[in-house]
C-alpha cells in the first residue's frame, strides 16, 4: 500500500504518552534471586506487542504485503513458482526489463563501480549525474535540476529547506506521505485543504498576510485514485495570492504531457509551476528522484537541503538507467500512446462489469470495495486466479474508501487485459463487489 500519513496502515491509534506506565507484560521476568521482577526490554518496545493486526491477517490467510517476486518486474512475474499477471506495478512504460536500459546500467558499473561512496555535496558528484540533470531540465523545461537518491528524499528535503519559520505551506489532503513528512519537518505553518477543493485553498490563502512566504504543494496525479489536480485553477489562485507552486509528478512523468514531461506540460503551464518533483522508480525504470526549478532555487537547495547533503548520492548505474529510459521515452512516443490505449481498454471493460472507478483519469484505476476485509480477500482470490493487484486501506485512503489499485503498463497485451477483466469480474461477483 501507499501511505498518506506517517503511521502504519495496520496500526490502531494509540493514546498520547501517559505519565506512568505499568511494566506488567511479557517484557518482565523474575529476577535472578526471585526477589522481584525486572524488565527485559525498554518501554519503547511495548508497542510491538500491541501491534497484532498483521499477525491476525496472516492467520486469516489474507496478509497482502511483502509478497516475494522471483523474476524481473514485467507484465508477468513469478510468485511461489507460478506466473502471475502484474497489475500492481508503477512501471507505466514497461521499461524495467528493457535490454537497452540494462546495458546502460551495466556499462556504468564497469566505468564507475557500484556506488559513489559519498554525498553529492562532497565526493559523490559524477559527470553522469550532471548529464542526467541537464537531460531532465530539457525534458521539463526548467533552468536547472537537482538529483536525490530517492523520491521520498526530494519532498522531505526540498519542502523543509524552502519553507521556513514565518512561512506557510498548503497541501491537498490526498498528497503522498513524503509531502506530508516534508511539511511536518519544516518550521513553517502547515495547512491541508480538502481534496482538490480550490475554494477551500483560496479561503485559507485569504487568511494569510499578503507578504508571507506561501508554498502550495500538490500531487500532479494522485497515486491512489488516479485523478489529476486541476492545475490551471490552482495556478491562477496561487498567482493571485503570491504563492509558489510545487507539483509532485511521481505518477505523471512518462504518463502526461509532451514526451511524458508531466502535469505542467499536460496543461501548458510550464512557466506557472515553480518547482517540479519527479521520481525514477516508476516510468523511468530505476531509483531516485529530482527537483526542477530556476537555477537560483536549485543552488539554494544544494546548500540547504539536508536529505541531499547528508545522503549518499544516486548510484551511477541508476543514473545511467534513467538516461537510457528518457531517451527511449522521447524517441518512442508510441509507448505512451499504447499506455493510454491499454488504460482505455481496461477502464471500459471494468465499467461494463459494473465496477466503481471513482474519478480516475489516468492509468491508475481504483476498484472501490469500501470494506477492509473485502479488499484483502479480493487481493488474495485474484492472486489465486493469477492476477497481482494492490489493496489500499486506511490511512492510504479514508476509512470506508478502501479499494483495489490497478495500474496499467504500456507493455500489457490485449490478451493480458482481457484475461484480467475475466478474473476481476468473476472474483468481483463472487465477493459481491459487482
Mark where each language-model region is.
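Conserved N-terminal alpha-helix of the aminotransferase class I/II PLP-enzyme fold
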Residues: 103, 107-151
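Active-site phosphate-binding strand-loop segment of PLP-dependent enzymes
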Residues: 191, 195-247
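Conserved PLP-binding catalytic core of the aspartate aminotransferase-like
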Residues: 337-346, 351-386, 396, 400-401, ...
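Active-site C-terminal subdomain of aminotransferase-like
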Residues: 241-244, 251, 256-361, 374
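Conserved PLP-anchoring active-site segment centered on the Schiff-base-forming lysine
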Residues: 158-177
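N-terminal "arm"/small-domain region of PLP-dependent enzymes with the aminotransferase-like
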Residues: 2-13, 18-30, 34-35, 45-114, ...
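PLP-dependent enzyme catalytic core of the Aspartate aminotransferase-like
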Residues: 1-33, 99, 103-107, 111, ...
Amino acid at each position: 500500500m501507499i501511505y498518506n500519513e506517517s503511521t502504519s496502515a495496520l496500526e490502531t491509534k494509540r493514546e498520547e504518552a501517559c505519565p506512568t506506565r505499568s511494566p506488567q507484560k511479557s517484557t518482565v521476568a523474575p529476577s535472578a534471586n526471585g526477589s522481584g521482577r525486572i524488565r527485559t526490554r525498554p518501554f519503547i518496545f511495548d508497542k510491538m506487542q500491541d501491534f497484532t493486526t498483521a499477525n491476525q491477517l496472516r492467520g486469516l490467510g489474507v496478509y497482502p504485503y511483502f509478497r516475494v517476486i522471483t523474476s524481473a518486474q514485467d507484465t508477468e512475474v513469478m510468485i511461489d513458482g507460478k506466473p502471475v499477471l502484474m497489475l500492481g506495478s508503477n512501471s507505466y512504460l514497461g521499461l524495467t526489463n528493457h535490454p537497452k536500459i540494462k546495458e546502460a546500467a551495466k556499462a556504468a558499473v564497469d566505468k564507475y563501480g557500484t556506488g559513489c561512496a559519498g554525498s553529492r555535496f562532497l565526493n559523490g558528484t559524477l559527470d553522469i549525474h550532471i548529464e542526467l540533470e541537464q537531460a531532465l531540465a530539457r525534458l521539463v523545461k526548467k533552468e536547472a535540476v537537482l538529483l536525490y537518491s530517492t523520491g521520498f528524499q526530494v519532498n522531505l528535503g526540498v519542502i523543509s529547506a524552502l519553507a521556513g519559520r514565518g512561512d506557510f505551506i498548503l497541501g491537498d489532503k490526498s498528497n503522498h506521505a513524503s509531502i506530508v513528512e516534508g511539511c511536518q519537518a519544516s518550521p513553517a505553518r502547515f495547512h491541508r485543504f480538502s481534496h482538490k477543493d480550490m475554494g477551500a485553498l483560496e479561503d485559507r490563502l485569504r487568511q494569510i498576510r499578503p507578504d508571507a512566504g506561501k508554498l502550495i504543494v500538490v500531487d500532479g496525479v494522485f497515486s491512489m485514485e488516479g485523478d489529476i489536480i486541476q492545475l490551471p485553477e490552482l495556478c491562477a489562485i496561487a498567482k493571485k495570492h503570491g504563492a509558489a507552486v510545487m507539483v509532485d509528478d511521481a505518477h505523471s512523468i512518462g504518463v502526461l504531457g509532451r514526451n511524458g514531461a508531466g502535469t505542467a506540460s499536460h496543461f501548458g503551464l510550464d512557466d506557472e509551476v515553480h518547482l517540479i518533483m519527479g521520481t525514477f522508480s516508476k516510468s523511468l525504470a530505476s531509483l531516485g528522484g529530482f527537483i526542477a526549478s530556476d537555477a537560483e532555487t536549485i543552488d539554494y537547495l544544494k546548500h540547504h537541503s539536508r536529505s541531499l547533503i547528508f545522503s549518499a548520492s544516486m548510484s551511477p548505474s541508476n543514473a545511467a538507467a534513467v538516461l537510457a529510459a528518457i531517451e527511449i521515452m522521447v524517441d518512442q512516443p508510441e509507448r505512451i500512446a499504447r499506455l493510454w490505449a491499454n488504460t482505455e481498454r481496461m477502464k471500459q471493460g471494468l465499467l461494463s462489469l459494473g465496477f466503481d472507478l471513482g474519478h480516475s483519469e489516468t492509468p491508475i484505476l481504483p476498484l472501490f470495495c469500501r470494506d477492509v476485509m473485502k479488499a484483502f480477500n479480493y487481493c488474495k482470490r485474484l492472486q489465486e486466479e493469477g492476477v497481482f493487484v494492490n489493496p489500499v486501506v486506511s490511512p492510504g485512503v479514508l476509512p470506508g474508501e478502501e479499494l483495489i489499485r490497478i495500474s496499467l503498463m504500456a507493455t500489457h497485451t490485449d490478451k493480458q487485459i482481457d484475461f484480467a477483466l475475466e478474473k476481476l469480474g468473476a472474483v468481483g461477483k463472487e465477493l459481491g463487489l459487482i
